[in-house]
Amino acid sequence: LLEARSDEEVSKLLQECGYPPLDAARPEEMDAALSQAREELLADLSDSAPDPRYIDIFKLKYDYHNAKAILKAAAVGTSPERMLMDMGRVPAVELKTAVESGELDGLPGDLPEAVAEAKSVLDTTRDPQLSDIVLDRWMYRDMAQVAEVTGSEFLRGYVAAQIDAANLRALIRTLRMGKNGDFLAGVLFEGGEIEPAAVLALANDRSGLAEVYGATRFAQAAEAGEAALKGGSLTEFEKRCDDAVSDYLAGAQMIP
């Protein structure tokens, strides 16, 4: 889908994958169809999983996405409805009510502390990027805790891969924006296989990208990132990051 050259091509690809005919002139229909498919998939997986926490680790990112949308909408006095995705551990409408009322204690995992801190940062700084970083940091911490409780080494590795992808994205975006290492240090996350210090060092010496990432699953993503820094496609870089995480998940079929 990322490589599709037009909305019409996206619509055709979706139909080939079993989606109903979609009007390319109405991209909101495509978004709705994709969201519905994801909701149905997560529901099916939840019903068949021996431990719901195996699925929670994939659902909780939607809780944090919704929290971001709700907080930012409240800050500017608009409705977050069109941005909400009902695929998290908490129904979107319930999360909206909890965040707007400040009654957070009933939320699962680290969400109460995460929302409270992000709201405080947003109220103080009026900078939604900073509040998003707070929520992302809590999200990866939440994911790591869920993985740890399940005892699944595979899920621990999945969380680490997600963090490594996020840190590589942060590095390339920081360099493209011409920001310095101080900025990058504030947006890197702990918990990946690649230490934040190693990523931070690349802010001053990007020639080390191949050395840091060459022997990892992110080798191709790093190559695409280096190309993006020279005027290449950022979309291709993002796709390579996603592919690296997807390749890791593909190994799940080998887990007994």
Identify the role of each PLM range.
Residues 1-256:
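Extended alpha-helical surfaces
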